[in-house]
Amino acid sequence: MTKTFIFGHKNPDTDAISSALIMADFEQQTGNTEAKAYRLGEISAETQFALDYFNVEAPELLNEDLKGQDVILVDHNEFQQSADTISNATIKHVIDHHRISNFETAGPLYYRAEPVGCSATILYKMYKERGFEIKPEIAGLMISAIISDSLLFKSPTCTKEDVDAAQALKDIANVDLEAYGLEMLKAGASTTDKSAETLVNMDAKSFNMGDYVTRIAQVNTVDIDEVLDRKEEFEKVMLEMSANEKYDLFVLVVTDIINSDSKILVVGAEKDKVGEAFKVQLDDGMAFLSGVVSRKKQVVPQITEVLTQ
Protein backbone atom coordinates (compact mmCIF):
# COMPACT_ATOMS: atom_id res chain seq x y z
CA MET A 1 0.00 0.00 0.00
CA THR A 2 1.23 3.50 -0.87
CA LYS A 3 2.33 5.71 2.00
CA THR A 4 -0.03 8.60 2.75
CA PHE A 5 1.26 11.84 4.29
CA ILE A 6 -1.30 13.71 6.40
CA PHE A 7 -0.66 17.22 7.68
CA GLY A 8 -2.12 20.61 8.53
CA HIS A 9 -0.79 24.06 7.69
CA LYS A 10 2.55 25.70 8.46
CA ASN A 11 2.86 27.24 11.94
CA PRO A 12 0.38 24.62 13.11
CA ASP A 13 -2.24 25.36 15.74
CA THR A 14 -4.08 22.80 17.84
CA ASP A 15 -6.61 22.01 15.10
CA ALA A 16 -3.89 21.47 12.48
CA ILE A 17 -1.96 19.03 14.69
CA SER A 18 -5.00 17.29 16.17
CA SER A 19 -6.79 16.89 12.84
CA ALA A 20 -3.70 15.33 11.25
CA LEU A 21 -3.53 12.77 14.06
CA ILE A 22 -7.29 12.18 13.95
CA MET A 23 -7.32 11.76 10.16
CA ALA A 24 -4.45 9.28 10.38
CA ASP A 25 -6.51 7.22 12.85
CA PHE A 26 -9.55 7.50 10.56
CA GLU A 27 -7.53 6.28 7.57
CA GLN A 28 -6.14 3.40 9.61
CA GLN A 29 -9.71 2.34 10.38
CA THR A 30 -10.53 2.38 6.64
CA GLY A 31 -7.66 -0.06 6.11
CA ASN A 32 -5.03 2.44 4.97
CA THR A 33 -2.29 1.16 7.23
CA GLU A 34 0.33 3.39 5.58
CA ALA A 35 -1.36 6.65 6.63
CA LYS A 36 0.77 8.77 8.95
CA ALA A 37 0.37 12.22 10.52
CA TYR A 38 3.07 14.87 10.13
CA ARG A 39 3.49 18.51 11.12
CA LEU A 40 4.81 21.54 9.26
CA GLY A 41 6.25 23.42 12.22
CA GLU A 42 6.87 23.50 15.93
CA ILE A 43 4.28 22.44 18.49
CA SER A 44 2.76 25.34 20.44
CA ALA A 45 2.47 25.32 24.23
CA GLU A 46 -1.30 25.01 23.95
CA THR A 47 -1.08 22.01 21.63
CA GLN A 48 1.61 20.37 23.77
CA PHE A 49 -0.68 20.71 26.79
CA ALA A 50 -3.40 18.80 24.92
CA LEU A 51 -1.01 16.12 23.69
CA ASP A 52 0.41 15.60 27.18
CA TYR A 53 -3.03 15.57 28.79
CA PHE A 54 -4.26 12.79 26.52
CA ASN A 55 -0.90 11.02 26.32
CA VAL A 56 -0.52 11.39 22.55
CA GLU A 57 2.84 11.65 20.79
CA ALA A 58 3.36 14.68 18.55
CA PRO A 59 3.53 14.03 14.79
CA GLU A 60 6.93 13.87 13.16
CA LEU A 61 8.21 17.01 11.41
CA LEU A 62 7.82 16.65 7.64
CA ASN A 63 11.15 16.95 5.84
CA GLU A 64 10.52 14.79 2.76
CA ASP A 65 10.06 15.93 -0.82
CA LEU A 66 6.43 15.18 -1.64
CA LYS A 67 6.94 14.75 -5.39
CA GLY A 68 4.66 11.91 -6.50
CA GLN A 69 3.54 11.19 -2.93
CA ASP A 70 -0.06 10.75 -1.81
CA VAL A 71 -1.11 13.41 0.68
CA ILE A 72 -4.15 14.41 2.71
CA LEU A 73 -4.50 18.04 3.74
CA VAL A 74 -6.35 18.97 6.91
CA ASP A 75 -7.27 22.42 8.22
CA HIS A 76 -6.00 24.22 5.10
CA ASN A 77 -5.98 24.17 1.32
CA GLU A 78 -4.04 27.26 0.17
CA PHE A 79 -0.69 26.17 -1.25
CA GLN A 80 1.27 29.02 0.36
CA GLN A 81 0.19 27.67 3.77
CA SER A 82 1.16 24.10 2.93
CA ALA A 83 4.33 22.06 2.46
CA ASP A 84 6.91 23.63 0.16
CA THR A 85 6.65 20.78 -2.37
CA ILE A 86 2.85 20.41 -2.24
CA SER A 87 2.42 21.34 -5.91
CA ASN A 88 4.30 18.15 -6.87
CA ALA A 89 2.22 15.87 -4.64
CA THR A 90 -0.92 13.89 -5.40
CA ILE A 91 -3.60 15.34 -3.15
CA LYS A 92 -6.11 12.62 -2.34
CA HIS A 93 -8.26 14.31 0.30
CA VAL A 94 -8.82 17.73 1.83
CA ILE A 95 -10.72 18.23 5.09
CA ASP A 96 -11.08 21.93 5.84
CA HIS A 97 -13.24 24.74 7.18
CA HIS A 98 -11.58 27.75 5.52
CA ARG A 99 -12.04 29.66 2.28
CA ILE A 100 -10.82 27.90 -0.87
CA SER A 101 -8.06 29.88 -2.57
CA ASN A 102 -4.87 29.27 -4.55
CA PHE A 103 -5.74 25.59 -4.86
CA GLU A 104 -5.85 23.26 -7.84
CA THR A 105 -5.05 19.64 -8.58
CA ALA A 106 -4.26 17.63 -11.69
CA GLY A 107 -6.83 14.97 -10.86
CA PRO A 108 -10.07 14.46 -8.95
CA LEU A 109 -10.02 14.20 -5.19
CA TYR A 110 -12.18 13.87 -2.11
CA TYR A 111 -12.75 17.43 -0.84
CA ARG A 112 -14.85 18.13 2.23
CA ALA A 113 -15.18 21.72 3.39
CA GLU A 114 -17.88 22.86 5.77
CA PRO A 115 -18.66 26.24 7.38
CA VAL A 116 -18.04 25.04 10.91
CA GLY A 117 -15.63 26.34 13.53
CA CYS A 118 -13.09 23.54 13.38
CA SER A 119 -11.79 20.81 11.07
CA ALA A 120 -12.04 18.31 13.92
CA THR A 121 -15.81 18.83 13.96
CA ILE A 122 -15.96 17.61 10.36
CA LEU A 123 -13.81 14.63 11.28
CA TYR A 124 -16.13 13.82 14.20
CA LYS A 125 -19.03 13.71 11.73
CA MET A 126 -17.02 11.43 9.42
CA TYR A 127 -16.40 8.97 12.28
CA LYS A 128 -20.11 8.93 13.10
CA GLU A 129 -21.08 8.47 9.45
CA ARG A 130 -18.79 5.45 9.11
CA GLY A 131 -19.55 4.01 12.55
CA PHE A 132 -15.85 4.12 13.47
CA GLU A 133 -14.62 3.85 17.05
CA ILE A 134 -13.65 7.15 18.70
CA LYS A 135 -11.01 6.25 21.25
CA PRO A 136 -10.65 8.45 24.39
CA GLU A 137 -7.46 10.10 23.15
CA ILE A 138 -9.03 10.84 19.76
CA ALA A 139 -12.06 12.32 21.52
CA GLY A 140 -9.68 14.43 23.59
CA LEU A 141 -7.90 15.72 20.50
CA MET A 142 -11.22 16.56 18.86
CA ILE A 143 -12.35 18.49 21.94
CA SER A 144 -9.00 20.29 22.20
CA ALA A 145 -9.16 21.40 18.57
CA ILE A 146 -12.76 22.61 18.88
CA ILE A 147 -12.05 24.56 22.07
CA SER A 148 -8.91 26.06 20.56
CA ASP A 149 -10.51 27.22 17.32
CA SER A 150 -13.68 28.46 19.02
CA LEU A 151 -11.93 30.04 22.04
CA LEU A 152 -14.07 27.90 24.33
CA PHE A 153 -17.17 28.40 22.17
CA LYS A 154 -16.94 32.23 22.26
CA SER A 155 -15.77 32.82 18.70
CA PRO A 156 -18.31 33.88 16.06
CA THR A 157 -17.01 31.00 13.94
CA CYS A 158 -18.37 28.52 16.48
CA THR A 159 -21.48 26.70 15.30
CA LYS A 160 -24.05 24.48 16.99
CA GLU A 161 -22.33 21.54 15.32
CA ASP A 162 -19.05 22.38 17.10
CA VAL A 163 -20.78 22.64 20.47
CA ASP A 164 -22.79 19.45 19.91
CA ALA A 165 -19.66 17.54 18.91
CA ALA A 166 -17.77 18.66 22.02
CA GLN A 167 -20.72 17.78 24.25
CA ALA A 168 -20.97 14.33 22.68
CA LEU A 169 -17.23 13.73 23.11
CA LYS A 170 -16.70 14.94 26.68
CA ASP A 171 -17.74 11.67 28.34
CA ILE A 172 -15.56 9.62 26.00
CA ALA A 173 -12.58 11.85 26.81
CA ASN A 174 -13.63 12.14 30.46
CA VAL A 175 -13.19 15.91 30.72
CA ASP A 176 -15.13 18.91 31.96
CA LEU A 177 -15.22 21.16 28.89
CA GLU A 178 -15.08 24.48 30.75
CA ALA A 179 -12.36 23.51 33.23
CA TYR A 180 -10.19 21.67 30.71
CA GLY A 181 -10.70 24.30 28.02
CA LEU A 182 -9.69 27.23 30.20
CA GLU A 183 -6.62 25.36 31.44
CA MET A 184 -5.57 24.52 27.88
CA LEU A 185 -6.10 28.06 26.56
CA LYS A 186 -4.16 29.56 29.45
CA ALA A 187 -1.29 27.14 28.77
CA GLY A 188 -1.00 28.67 25.32
CA ALA A 189 -1.48 32.27 26.43
CA SER A 190 1.82 32.75 28.27
CA THR A 191 3.97 35.17 26.25
CA THR A 192 6.64 36.52 28.61
CA ASP A 193 9.01 33.60 28.00
CA LYS A 194 8.81 33.88 24.20
CA SER A 195 10.74 36.12 21.82
CA ALA A 196 8.94 38.57 19.54
CA GLU A 197 10.00 36.46 16.56
CA THR A 198 8.53 33.32 18.13
CA LEU A 199 5.24 35.04 18.93
CA VAL A 200 4.89 36.53 15.46
CA ASN A 201 5.46 33.14 13.83
CA MET A 202 3.57 30.96 16.29
CA ASP A 203 0.18 31.25 14.58
CA ALA A 204 0.67 33.10 11.30
CA LYS A 205 -0.71 32.60 7.80
CA SER A 206 -0.06 34.22 4.44
CA PHE A 207 -2.93 35.20 2.15
CA ASN A 208 -3.09 36.29 -1.47
CA MET A 209 -5.52 39.22 -1.55
CA GLY A 210 -5.83 40.55 -5.07
CA ASP A 211 -2.41 41.92 -6.01
CA TYR A 212 -1.19 41.88 -2.42
CA VAL A 213 0.42 39.28 -0.18
CA THR A 214 -0.76 39.74 3.39
CA ARG A 215 0.63 38.05 6.48
CA ILE A 216 -1.70 37.81 9.46
CA ALA A 217 -0.38 36.56 12.80
CA GLN A 218 -2.43 36.02 15.94
CA VAL A 219 -1.34 35.85 19.56
CA ASN A 220 -3.75 34.78 22.30
CA THR A 221 -3.22 36.26 25.74
CA VAL A 222 -4.89 37.20 29.01
CA ASP A 223 -3.20 40.63 28.98
CA ILE A 224 -3.07 42.53 25.67
CA ASP A 225 -1.14 45.49 27.06
CA GLU A 226 1.59 43.24 28.46
CA VAL A 227 2.13 41.83 24.97
CA LEU A 228 2.06 45.20 23.19
CA ASP A 229 4.51 46.73 25.65
CA ARG A 230 6.96 45.03 23.26
CA LYS A 231 5.56 46.89 20.25
CA GLU A 232 8.97 48.02 18.95
CA GLU A 233 10.28 44.45 19.06
CA PHE A 234 7.29 43.22 17.07
CA GLU A 235 7.58 46.01 14.50
CA LYS A 236 11.26 45.23 13.92
CA VAL A 237 10.55 41.53 13.33
CA MET A 238 7.50 42.24 11.14
CA LEU A 239 9.38 44.73 8.96
CA GLU A 240 12.34 42.38 8.54
CA MET A 241 10.06 39.48 7.59
CA SER A 242 8.10 41.67 5.19
CA ALA A 243 11.30 42.67 3.41
CA ASN A 244 12.59 39.10 3.23
CA GLU A 245 9.32 37.42 2.25
CA LYS A 246 7.91 40.27 0.11
CA TYR A 247 4.79 40.81 2.22
CA ASP A 248 2.85 43.93 1.25
CA LEU A 249 1.08 44.01 4.59
CA PHE A 250 1.73 42.41 7.99
CA VAL A 251 -0.98 42.40 10.64
CA LEU A 252 -0.48 41.17 14.20
CA VAL A 253 -3.75 40.43 16.01
CA VAL A 254 -3.36 40.24 19.80
CA THR A 255 -6.48 38.63 21.26
CA ASP A 256 -7.74 38.71 24.85
CA ILE A 257 -9.15 35.21 25.36
CA ILE A 258 -11.02 36.22 28.52
CA ASN A 259 -12.81 39.37 27.31
CA SER A 260 -13.00 38.42 23.60
CA ASP A 261 -11.46 41.60 22.17
CA SER A 262 -8.31 42.29 20.13
CA LYS A 263 -5.76 44.95 19.33
CA ILE A 264 -3.96 45.01 16.00
CA LEU A 265 -0.48 46.17 15.08
CA VAL A 266 0.04 46.83 11.37
CA VAL A 267 3.11 47.47 9.21
CA GLY A 268 3.37 47.88 5.45
CA ALA A 269 2.69 50.39 2.72
CA GLU A 270 -1.01 49.51 2.67
CA LYS A 271 -1.58 49.73 6.42
CA ASP A 272 -4.14 52.54 6.11
CA LYS A 273 -6.31 50.06 4.21
CA VAL A 274 -6.55 48.01 7.41
CA GLY A 275 -8.00 50.98 9.26
CA GLU A 276 -10.48 51.34 6.41
CA ALA A 277 -11.38 47.65 6.65
CA PHE A 278 -12.33 47.93 10.31
CA LYS A 279 -13.59 51.53 10.17
CA VAL A 280 -11.04 52.63 12.76
CA GLN A 281 -8.19 55.12 12.83
CA LEU A 282 -4.79 53.52 13.36
CA ASP A 283 -2.83 55.23 16.12
CA ASP A 284 0.89 54.63 15.65
CA GLY A 285 0.00 51.52 13.65
CA MET A 286 -2.38 50.15 16.29
CA ALA A 287 -6.13 49.96 16.88
CA PHE A 288 -8.56 48.31 19.29
CA LEU A 289 -11.13 45.95 17.73
CA SER A 290 -14.04 45.30 20.07
CA GLY A 291 -15.43 41.76 19.90
CA VAL A 292 -12.93 40.62 17.27
CA VAL A 293 -11.39 37.21 18.00
CA SER A 294 -11.54 35.24 14.73
CA ARG A 295 -8.93 35.73 12.02
CA LYS A 296 -10.94 33.58 9.60
CA LYS A 297 -14.27 35.36 9.99
CA GLN A 298 -13.52 38.82 11.40
CA VAL A 299 -10.13 39.76 9.92
CA VAL A 300 -9.34 38.00 6.62
CA PRO A 301 -12.62 38.82 4.79
CA GLN A 302 -12.57 42.47 5.87
CA ILE A 303 -8.99 43.09 4.73
CA THR A 304 -9.52 41.07 1.55
CA GLU A 305 -12.47 43.27 0.64
CA VAL A 306 -10.55 46.56 0.82
CA LEU A 307 -7.48 45.16 -0.95
CA THR A 308 -9.47 43.77 -3.87
CA GLN A 309 -11.69 46.77 -4.57
Swiss-Prot record:
Cell compartment(s), UniProt: Cytoplasm
Keyword Ligase: no
Cofactor binding mode and count: Binds 2 manganese ions per subunit.
Top EC class for this record: hydrolase
Reaction catalysis annotation: diphosphate + H2O = 2 phosphate + H(+)
Residues annotated as binding Mn(2+) 1: H9, D13, D75
Organism (species): Staphylococcus epidermidis (strain ATCC 12228 / FDA PCI 1200)
Keywords linked to the UniProt accession: Cytoplasm, Hydrolase, Manganese, Metal-binding
E.C. code: 3.6.1.1
Residues annotated to bind Mn(2+) 2: D15, D75, H97, D149
Primary localization class, coarse: cytoplasm
Entry similarity comment: Belongs to the PPase class C family.
HAMAP family reported in the protein's UniProt record: PPase_C (MF_00207)
SMART domains with a match to the protein in the record: DHHA2
UniProt key word Nuclease: no
Underlying gene: ppaC
GO cellular component term, pick one: cytoplasm
Protein known as: Probable manganese-dependent inorganic pyrophosphatase
Entry cofactors: Mn(2+)
Pfam families in the cross-refs: DHH, DHHA2
